[in-house]
Amino acid sequence: MLRNATKGAARRAVTELSQYPKPGEKLHGFTLLRSKHVPELELTALHLQHDKTGAEHLHIARDDSNNVFSIGFKTNPPDDTGVPHILEHTTLCGSQKYPIRDPFFKMLPRTLSNFMNAFTASDHTFYPFATTNAQDFKNLMSVYLDATLHPLLKETDFTQEGWRIGPENPQALVAAEGNAKPEDRKLVFKGVVYNEMKGQMSDAAYLFWIRFQDHIFPDIHNSGGDPQKITDLTYQQLKKFHADHYHPSNAKVFTYGDMPLADHLKEIGAQLDVFEKIRADVAHHSPIDLSSGPREVKLYGPIDPLVDANKQFKTSVSWVLGETNNVVESFSLALISALLMDGYGSPLYKGLIESGLGTDWSPNTGYDSSGKLGIFSIGLSGVQEEDVPKVKAKVQEILRSMRDKGFERSKIDGYLHQLELGLKHKTANFGMSLLHRLKPKWFVGVDPFDSLAWNDTIAAFETELAKGGYLEGLIDKYLINDNTLSFTMAPSPTFSQELAQEEETRLSTKISEVVKAAGSEEEARAALEARELKLLAEQSKTNTEDLGCLPSVHVKDIPRQKDSVILRHDNTARVKTQWHEAPTNGLTYFRAINQLENLPDELRSLIPLFTDSIMRLGTKDMTMEQLEDLIKLKTGGVSVGYHSASHPTDFTRATEGLMFSGMALDRHVPTMFDLLRKLVVETDFDSPQAAQQIRQLLQASADGVVNDIASSGHAYARRAAESGLTWDSFLKEQVSGLSQVKLVTSLASRPESDPLEDVIAKLKQIQQFALAGNLRTAITCDSGSVSDNAKALLNFVNSLPSEAVTFPSRGPPNFTRDIKTFYPLPYQVYYGALALPTASYTASVNAPLQILSQLLTHKHLHHEIREKGGAYGGGSYARPLDGIFGFYSYRDPNPVNTLKIMRNAGQWAVDKEWTDRDLEDAKISVFQGVDAPKAVNEEGMAQFLYGITDEMKQKRREELLDVTKDQVREVAQEYVVKALNNGSERVVFLGEKRDWVDKSWAVKEMDINGST
């Protein structure tokens, strides 16, 4: 009782208004403007202003130990050079108080933060972090404030992070001592942001979205930067942009959590007080004026080699709506968007996608309330050229119909129920989610207090709804007119070649300018090479400079013993059940795994399609629209997916199966179970519409898959490389890797006349065993709900098929792969991975292997692959449960050099004289993940999903804390150097096939042939 009472008092103390200044009162140079308690979110909001500069500060006091900080600036881009984006990078490269190279990245292993990053949005830039440690919070806040307000902004940092012209392989120039090969001396564009944005522009979905933004917001330029314009940015322009925009008068500061506001204000106020007030950049750019009637724009984009060439148009129709500071209307328009488009039963899905006009929504589809005026867009991808005009006509027809018919109250209630559950669900990153929700609107003048007022907004909405015709009136007001922008992107088979040719021409022009300034071609080349070598020398200082100025937490701050999650196991419902009793705010969380033995490969690979299909087809008795309505009204969502895991004591063994999950209010748990059963057992694969609906699912998955790979190409490369090493990795790659991509695109390419009988027969096979057999379950709920949940679980289990489906036993799995594999894909940059087998989770060597991965990433690979090589990212990783150690690179312009760095990294680690500080940094870095806060429904899941007991975790915790330098060198020698010498590695790269991909590589074309 005493502990609970104390906890309640602590919560009241954090959010109790009486402990804070009253409006008009001052604290550490700030004046409190207003404050408000928001009971539905269990928080108190305080809005302050810095007296001297006018900087705004929003503090959210809440009983949450995962505290958040962010400082942001209004950064309207003046052009398409990406100056806000490049400035975001260069501010983090050194500051007055921390005058070392890259303090941001060097802080990563010196903090226990669970989130650290920086983001460039269309009209603002912000720098957030989250941590549970008070000293860590102070350390990071000091680094962030100094980086943004007092950056060094050295020219070498601008050329490294922004753009430059230099020899393709400067390391070879150094090694060759003046006798470098012509290909190494070839002059190319370089720069981290330049290569990042080249990678972005390879993504057709991003290209469509950014070009749409260019036309709907002609006054807002591309803040990320267009590679064709980035090379126009000068160092002087960068410095001026910082002076004009990164000023407290133009800043918004956000703090969240249970740490004292006074402590934050004391530190922040001291940093801001050195500035004088200036005129802030508060301009809120409006979208295009469409009041004079329709406008049409047609542009060209890349062609997708894995999708039907006749179905690659993307098109959308957009309206400009009212001001987003009307939060009730903005909420209502977001609800209209959901009612029109969410789910397979929604009117726009049925009228546009189910009818065959397109395969999926366009990237800009939906209601965008991030600007001063809202934008409502409806569009499709996967459209045939002759159908492009039909899309707009069909959209307008459906909107008129919904204006006249109206929306069923049950569908509105389902949406509101999802919001209720969202408020009740206790996430581990609530503060960061709140920041992302409030921030964009705050920067365009929407009052954050209005955005926080959930109950007030819902009450006002209900009042309007009760009057009748409210939502229909909004459709009539904003969407039943032709004041539209129709935006279309057509596929061009020459787009990529034209892009490459443009870059060559631009490079020649820029080199000519350098030649003119230098006096001769020889002197120009010498100057560019000298600058590159100077940058290389500057970058080489990174591993030798004194980091004593940087603050840090210490390993001694990490508790040696971790509190266990109390779990209970029983078989009362005829299945093995793990119970976790915890405060869940009246919610019950459910998971189940049906373990499958000897599952044939051809069935496993179709499980993703099966899980999509049961959420699409409906049953004999209920349409999918009816099922979706029930899911929204009675649950927080139900899902089915594939699950596999290595055995913690033997990584060569693996189990696999289907996983089921759901969340509901306690009173709706029986309905949640019944919905899961209906979806899995009763889905009607024999309905006349089944083949067409499955084909549409395949086409939606295939549409834009090249873009999906581009956004996380290193993850696909890793999965492909790892699949040749362990059984579990092979299984995962089959359902979520390039093998799955190949299968989906091949099935999607089958002719419309194909009834997909072979596919449907296999999906029905999966249905027979999906919920039959070796089921085990896990439930997280309040103690008072256990009895009712146990009864509901028993009824659920009794309703399931009783006989398990068995498959013939198989021989030992064969998952051997070529040592080096290359996948040709149409990207301007590369993604790569090198993976090696190691040891099982419980093996003592796994702790030093994980420390080694951090040491290599932070002390070597980031420096070599990103800073010197120009890739957007690169590093090392250890997967202890899977028994894998590996390397990766992301948006990489220099794959040959990167692969060389990866292969030499093990020997580098063996030869390196590691310091105690190095080891300390690596351990701290590992524990960021080990001790990251977890949502209540994630507690105990390591044991349920992977068989990792608290004893195993505690043993590993102690081993991580006790790792020595000798152990690091030993595992580097044994599991990296020796393994590479033995040819144990698997290497995979994705990208454009060039001369360096010689006969030593197995080239795997992503061809499609329509087979399963």
Swiss-Prot record:
InterPro entries: Metalloenz_LuxS/M16, Pept_M16_N, Peptidase_M16_C, Peptidase_M16C_assoc, PreP_C. Binds 1 zinc ion per subunit. One of its GO terms (molecular function) is zinc ion binding. Residues 1-13 form a transit peptide. The active site is at 88 (proton acceptor), 161. Its main location: mitochondrion. The keyword Hydrolase applies. It holds the Pfam family PreP_C. One of its GO terms (cellular component) is mitochondrial intermembrane space. It is found in: Mitochondrion intermembrane space; Mitochondrion matrix. Its EC number is 3.4.24.-. Keywords: Hydrolase, Metal-binding, Metalloprotease, Mitochondrion, Protease, Transit peptide, Zinc. It comes from the Eukaryota. Its cofactor is Zn(2+). Zn(2+) binds at residues 85, 89, 196. Signal peptide: none annotated. It is an enzyme of class 3 (hydrolase). One of its GO terms (biological process) is protein processing. Monomer and homodimer; homodimerization is induced by binding of the substrate. Belongs to the peptidase M16 family. PreP subfamily. Degrades mitochondrial transit peptides after their cleavage in the intermembrane space or in the matrix, and presequence peptides; clearance of these peptides is required to keep the presequence processing machinery running. Preferentially cleaves the N-terminal side of paired basic amino acid residues. Also degrades other unstructured peptides. May function as an ATP-dependent peptidase as opposed to a metalloendopeptidase. This is Presequence protease, mitochondrial.
